[in-house]
Design a protein with these regions (language model features):
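An acidic, glycine-rich "communication" segment
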Residues: 339-388
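Bacterial N-terminal signal peptides
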Residues: 43-54
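Ligand-binding face of N-terminal immunoglobulin V-set domains in extracellular IgSF glycoproteins
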Residues: 90-114, 119-125, 130-134, 138-188, ...
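Aromatic-Pro/Gly-enriched surface loop or interdomain linker
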Residues: 61, 113-115, 119-123, 132-137, ...
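Helical hinge/lid and interdomain linker segments adjacent to catalytic or ligand-binding clefts
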Residues: 145-161, 167-176, 261-347
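N-terminal secretory signal peptides that target proteins for export/translocation
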Residues: 1-40
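Proline/serine/threonine-rich low-complexity linkers at boundaries of modular beta-sandwich domains
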Residues: 66-88
Length: 388
């Protein structure tokens, strides 16, 4: 059945969802370079070129995204915050993503004697942009004292993984994959902030596989618990060559070397999420981290979407995406400055040795910003420009 779009680019209800080429004709690689301005028409044309095919369409009502977005959303006045939020209550998830049915755990630093944690999923939801999914349980005795984050002066790494767990949320086994935010709100002052994490569906064979640019979120993140934070660009004592996922995000405030208009999810990922879900696409979500540690799952989908400021890719990340393309998966780059710096991953330094918690990029060579003008990564791996 032919799909019909209204004047706002929205798929008219009742039509079948867009279809995807299974493996022939050859996979397409599409790019929307101007991700930081309004290129909706180009995005739409690219999606149509990649996705419209001759395969058997799924029934519109069977699409989990359509069903989820039909539920009443919550207005942005309820879930949104200004910038990175209140610095007196900040936290992070113990992983950037969790499979549905797992438990998300949060480490939070605050002097508050009481606070709430509401969990929202980002989407369209009648234009509200998010829907309340539940509340997390505070497991720590409050007020909770957290130690100073661990640091390494030679690399600039700051790792707050030594903080104790403060709260948790049991992700329902029926949860819909997506970008989720835990909104932390102090009971006394009303100060609030966000913890961002992704809910995966590792068994999914959805048409679209949406990858966030979380490595870039961290590359520009300058969080430090004692005015000692560093990003891969700047910070107290100079730039870092290693940054940790065991930190709250201050990226939305800027100051980490780029700008909040370019380097955070509400710039590019969030508008794309709203558009995709408003139009009923069959989509599940993944991360830069997961494109490396479970990149084999990319082949289970018809289209791989790079969305946002997708600047930092590891070697395994690129190898998995290339292998998926060669196997017939279409690639669509709704991103800018993508696949620019080559990275590698290390374990955390918090004593747990948790994998995929440290992003490493020495910016080797002499081309690009903040380079070390040579081979400076102590390993044999190159962590400089991909194009050098």
């Amino acid at each position: 059945m032919k799909n019909v779009f209204n004047s706002k680019g929205k798929l008219v209800a009742g039509d079948s969802p867009l279809q995807v080429y299974p493996s022939t004709p050859p996979p397409a690689i599409l790019k929307c370079r101007d991700i930081f301005s309004n290129c909706l028409l180009l995005r739409l044309l690219a999606i149509l070129l990649v996705i419209i095919g001759t395969g058997t369409s799924k029934l519109y009502a069977q699409n989990a995204i359509v069903t989820e977005n039909a539920k009443p959303g919550n207005p942005s006045s309820e879930w949104q915050i200004s910038g990175a939020g209140d610095l007196s209550i900040q936290g992070f998830a113990t992983d950037i993503s969790y499979n549905k049915g797992e438990t998300a755990r949060f480490k939070i630093k605050t002097s508050a004697r009481a606070y709430t944690i509401n969990i929202y999923r980002l989407g369209y939801y009648q234009g509200n942009g998010a829907r309340l999914q539940g509340t997390a349980t505070v497991t720590a005795t409050l007020p909770q004292s957290q130690p100073n984050c661990l640091t390494n002066s030679s690399t600039g790494l700051l790792d707050c993984g030594n903080w104790a767990v403060s709260a948790q949320w049991a992700i329902p086994s029926t949860a819909v994959s997506g970008l989720y935010i835990a909104k932390l709100t102090r009971t006394d002052t009303g100060g609030s902030s966000h913890i961002v994490f992704i809910v995966r569906d590792d068994a999914s064979t959805s048409d679209l596989f949406f990858q966030t640019s979380d490595a870039t979120w961290q590359a520009y993140n300058i969080y430090g618990d004692n005015n000692n934070g560093r990003s891969l660009y700047t910070g107290s004592g100079g730039k870092a060559v290693k940054v940790s996922y065991n930190r709250p995000f201050l990226t939305r405030n800027g100051g980490g070397g780029g700008g909040p208009q370019e380097d955070w999810l509400f710039n590019a990922e969030y508008p794309m999420i709203r558009w995709i879900e408003a139009n009923g696409y069959d989509v599940t979500y993944t991360t830069n981290v997961d494109s490396d540690r479970r990149g084999n799952l990319i082949r289970n989908h018809r289209v791989f979407l790079s969305v946002g400021h997708d600047e930092y890719w590891s070697g395994a990340h690129r190898a998995y995406v290339t292998a998926a393309r060669n196997a017939g998966v279409n690639l669509a780059f709704f991103s800018g400055n993508e696949v620019y710096w080559k990275t590698r991953w290390e374990n955390s330094i918090d004593g747990s040795g948790t994998s995929y918690r440290t992003l490493v990029c020495y910016k080797e060579g002499s081309t690009g910003e903040n380079t070390c003008n040579g081979k400076c990564d102590p390993t044999s791996n190159w962590t400089g420009l991909w194009r050098s």
